Amino acid sequence: MSGFYHKHFLKLLDFTPAELNSLLQLAAKLKADKKSGKEEAKLTGKNIALIFEKDSTRTRCSFEVAAYDQGARVTYLGPSGSQIGHKESIKDTARVLGRMYDGIQYRGYGQEIVETLAEYAGVPVWNGLTNEFHPTQLLADLLTMQEHLPGKPFNEMTLVYAGDARNNMGNSMLEAAALTGLDLRLVAPQACWPEAALVTECRALAQQNGGNITLTEDVAKGVEGADFIYTDVWVSMGEAKEKWAERIALLRDYQVNSKMMQLTGNPEVKFLHCLPAFHDDQTTLGKKMAEEFGLHGGMEVTDEVFESAASIVFDQAENRMHTIKAVMVATLSK
C-alpha cells in the first residue's frame, strides 16, 4: 500500500489523519472481502514473529488469523519462549529476528522496547500493546464507531472514556482524537488523568482537525450527549491487593451502569470495552472483587449494560483482527 510499505506501527501520532483514514478504509475492505469470500492473499510466503511478554487472547488470535488469511506464517514467542531482555538485549534480538522474519509484533512493557526493536530490526515492527500505548486497539475502536454511525464523520462524534484514563488506553484515545477530530471526554478522577504534556499536544492537534478534548471529574456533565461510552478494567491480577482497594474506592463513581447510560440523554448511545471485562463474578478476579468489595454484578461496567443491546464490545473484538490485518497488509505489501 503506497506510503505504508516497510513502515512501523508504534503509535497513532506517527501517522497523519489521511494515513489513519486509509488504514481504516483498507480494514473495511478486507473485512468485506473476507465475508464475501473474495479475500486476496497479499502476504503469501511472509514470515511473522509474534513476541508476547504479556499474554493476550484477542491480540494473539487477531494477528494469527489475520496472517493465515493473508497466506503468511507466524511464530509465537510467549513470555517464557524467548530470551528478549534477559539473556539477550533488545537490540540483538531485533537484529536476529530481522534476518529471519518479514515483520515483528511486540506486546509487552515499555514503549522504549518496541521503539528499539523498530530501530534495529530492519523490518516492520507493530505495537500490539505497551505500557504507554495500544494503537491496534484504537484502530478497531474507530472502525467499530464508523460502522455504528455510518452517517457521521468522526468530528461529529462524541466519545466518552470513563474510569482510569492514566494508562495506554487513555493515551491512545488522546492520539486518536487528535487525528480524527473526535469530541473526546475523559471522565475520571483527576488522579487518573493522562500526563499533561500529552493532553496539551493532542488537544492542539484535535482542534486543528475540528475536535475537542475535555478532562472532567463531573460524570453528568461529561457524558451528556455521548454517542459512545467506553471503559476498561480498574485492576489487574498482577497488582497488589492494597492497590485494589485504593483503585476501587477512587473509581466506584465512574462505573458504567444504566444510570450513566441514561445521563447521556441519547437513547442510541453505545457501550465499548477493549476486553476482558469484569462485568460479573464468573472469573477468578471478578469473584474476588464481588467477595471482598461487594462488587456483585460488575466492576467497571455492570452486567446489565455489558449484556444490553447497547453493547457493541464483540464487534470491537472482531474488528481487532480486520484492522490488524490492514496494518500487516499495508506495511508488508507494495
UniProtKB/Swiss-Prot annotation:
Binding site for L-ornithine: 168, 232, 236-237
E.C. number(s) listed in UniProt: 2.1.3.3
One GO term describing the cellular component: cytoplasm
Subcellular location: Cytoplasm
Record InterPro entries: Asp/Orn_carbamoyltranf_P-bd, Asp/Orn_carbamoylTrfase, Asp/Orn_carbamoylTrfase_sf, Asp_carbamoyltransf_Asp/Orn-bd, Orn/put_carbamltrans, OTCase_ArgI
Pathway: Amino-acid biosynthesis; L-arginine biosynthesis; L-arginine from L-ornithine and carbamoyl phosphate: step 1/3
Pfam family, one: OTCace_N
Disulphide bond pairs: none
Keyword Ligase among record annotations: no
GO biological process: arginine biosynthetic process via ornithine; citrulline biosynthetic process; L-arginine biosynthetic process
Record keywords: Amino-acid biosynthesis, Arginine biosynthesis, Cytoplasm, Transferase
Enzyme class name: transferase
Origin: domain of life: Bacteria
GO molecular function terms attached to this record: amino acid binding; ornithine carbamoyltransferase activity
Function: Reversibly catalyzes the transfer of the carbamoyl group from carbamoyl phosphate (CP) to the N(epsilon) atom of ornithine (ORN) to produce L-citrulline.
Assigned protein family: Belongs to the aspartate/ornithine carbamoyltransferase superfamily. OTCase family.
Name of this protein: Ornithine carbamoyltransferase
